Amino acid sequence: MALRAAAGMHPRSLEGARVGLPNTWHGAVVRHADEIVGMGRVVGDGGCFFQIVDICVHPEHQGRGLGKRIMADLVAAIRERTPPGSYVSLIADGEAHRLYEQFGFAPTAPASIGMYWRP
């Protein structure tokens, strides 16, 4: 929760984290002096659909390639463990699309657009 806040990400409830984190399909963390300074997760149904979420690096550790290391770990797990034809998506905030493009992700527009709803 502290890393999300430090990186300027939208806050999540403690209750939501307690339910959601154990359902992570694959996760990656980067530690510095026993502190988590970077993270990323893959969530999904385990067969057809996967989403990369929670990619962030603490501002004091940005610009060192940690985001790229996290993405490389997540993409490697996806390539190794998902069935053929799986669909992997993510939402790119700000300039993060530049990182994701390095791993083969492409905008879906104009064929489709991402949408969200917060109940």
Q: Where are the model-predicted features located?
A:
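Short amphipathic alpha-helix that is part of the acyltransferase structural core
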Residues: 1-15
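A short helix-loop-beta-strand connector motif used in the catalytic cores of GNAT acetyltransferases and
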Residues: 18-29, 84-86
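Conserved beta-strand in the GNAT
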Residues: 29, 35-44, 48-51, 56
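A conserved beta-turn-beta hairpin within the catalytic core of GNAT-like acetyltransferases
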Residues: 44-52, 62, 84, 110-111
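Conserved acetyl-CoA pyrophosphate-binding loop and the N-cap/start of the following alpha-helix
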Residues: 61, 65-73
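Conserved GNAT acetyl-CoA-binding A-motif
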Residues: 71, 78-92
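Conserved catalytic-core motifs of GNAT/GCN5-like acyltransferases
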Residues: 85, 89-91, 101, 106-119
